[in-house]
C-alpha cells in the first residue's frame, strides 16, 4: 500500500473558514466538502508543499498572513482517479491553522465549488469524514 503525507490548511478569514467541494469524479472524497490540500512531493519541505498546494488549488491571489502547524492524523482511504481507477492509500494528514488577508480564491479542476463558512453554518455542509473530524477537534462542530 502506498503512503502519502498530506498537508491541509484550515484557512480562516474574518471568522469564516474556507471549504472546497470536491469534484464528483475524483479524489478521496468525491462530491463532498473538504479542506484543500495535497501531497508532499519527494524532497519538498512541509511549508513549501503547503504553499504550493494552496497556489495550485486555490490560486495565486489568496494571501496567507499566518501559517501555524496544528495537528496530525492518519487513516487509510480509497482514492478515485478521473479515469475511474481506485487505489487504497495510507494517508498521514498534517493540518495547519492559517489566516488569510483576503478571500480571493480561484479553484482548480479538483473542486467544483468553494465557500467561506461561519462556524455556526458548518453543520449544513456535507463534510467528508476527515474534515468533520478536524473541525470537531478544533471545536468548530
Swiss-Prot record:
A motif (Nudix box) lies at residues 38-59. It comes from the Bacteria. Its cofactor is Mg(2+). InterPro entries: Nucleoside_triphosphatase_NudI, Nudix_hydrolase, NUDIX_hydrolase-like_dom_sf, NUDIX_hydrolase_CS, NUDIX_hydrolase_dom. PROSITE patterns: NUDIX (PS51462), NUDIX_BOX (PS00893). Its EC number is 3.6.1.9, 3.6.1.12, 3.6.1.-, 3.6.1.23. It catalyses: a ribonucleoside 5'-triphosphate + H2O = a ribonucleoside 5'-phosphate + diphosphate + H(+); a 2'-deoxyribonucleoside 5'-triphosphate + H2O = a 2'-deoxyribonucleoside 5'-phosphate + diphosphate + H(+); dUTP + H2O = dUMP + diphosphate + H(+); dTTP + H2O = dTMP + diphosphate + H(+). Gene3D superfamilies: Nucleoside Triphosphate Pyrophosphohydrolase. Keywords: Hydrolase, Magnesium. Residues 1-141 form the Nudix hydrolase domain. GO terms for molecular function: dCTP diphosphatase activity; dTTP diphosphatase activity; dUTP diphosphatase activity; magnesium ion binding. Catalyzes the hydrolysis of nucleoside triphosphates, with a preference for pyrimidine deoxynucleoside triphosphates (dUTP, dTTP and dCTP). Monomer. NCBIfam families: PRK15472.1. Belongs to the Nudix hydrolase family. NudI subfamily. This is Nucleoside triphosphatase NudI.
Amino acid at each position: 500500500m502506498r503512503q502519502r503525507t498530506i498537508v491541509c490548511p484550515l484557512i480562516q478569514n474574518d471568522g469564516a473558514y474556507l471549504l472546497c467541494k470536491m469534484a464528483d469524479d475524483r479524489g478521496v472524497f468525491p462530491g463532498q466538502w473538504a479542506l484543500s490540500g495535497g501531497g508532499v512531493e519527494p524532497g519538498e519541505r512541509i511549508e513549501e508543499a503547503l504553499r504550493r498546494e494552496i497556489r495550485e488549488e486555490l490560486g495565486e491571489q489568496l494571501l496567507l498572513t499566518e501559517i501555524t502547524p496544528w495537528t496530525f492524523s492518519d487513516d487509510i482511504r480509497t482514492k478515485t482517479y478521473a479515469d475511474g481507477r481506485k487505489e487504497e492509500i495510507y494517508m498521514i494528514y498534517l493540518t495547519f491553522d492559517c489566516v488569510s488577508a483576503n478571500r480571493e480564491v480561484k479553484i482548480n479542476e479538483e473542486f467544483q465549488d468553494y465557500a467561506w463558512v461561519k462556524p455556526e453554518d458548518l453543520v449544513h455542509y456535507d463534510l467528508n469524514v476527515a474534515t468533520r473530524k478536524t473541525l470537531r477537534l478544533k471545536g468548530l462542530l
